[in-house]
């Protein structure tokens, strides 16, 4: 009987150390759309030039609870006259419960895996904003967050080597 209780207690500890990953919530943290040259932008020939900026951040907000934010900024100018057609910005966020990972695994999960889950939502928000501004669809391509994460780690490693 005592042996069964010890095994149950040890099993409980194993359960606490097991990998836990769940998306708790997805939400828009910040959203903005500006069309500073409307309505004149609609009266000229429109040959868009798209500038895209993408950034990810993350922070711990509770025990085993992390907020990850994917910020997408799309600025479109008209090649004909250089006027800004629109500026759309979305901060798509998610709350993730994560436990049982090493520090390196956690950093990778927060820096690549979670942003990969959030990006389709950010892309949809940008597309909705552009559509409501009555501009042609802005089809954002998928993003290789794994590659971005690898580049970031490489830069950090090189910076650490150069600091020594």
From Swiss-Prot:
Molecular-function GO terms, alphabetical: unfolded protein binding
Cysteine pairs bridged by disulfides in the record: none
Keyword Transport among record annotations: yes
InterPro entries: SecB, SecB-like_sf
GO CC annotations, alphabetized: cytoplasm
SUPFAM superfamilies: SecB-like
Pfam families named in the record: SecB (PF02556)
Highest taxon, organism lineage: Bacteria
An annotated GO BP: protein folding
NCBIfam families xref list: PRK05751.1-4, secB
Quaternary structure and interacting proteins, as annotated: Homotetramer, a dimer of dimers. One homotetramer interacts with 1 SecA dimer.
Name used for this protein in its record: Protein-export protein SecB
Organism: Chromohalobacter salexigens (strain ATCC BAA-138 / DSM 3043 / CIP 106854 / NCIMB 13768 / 1H11)
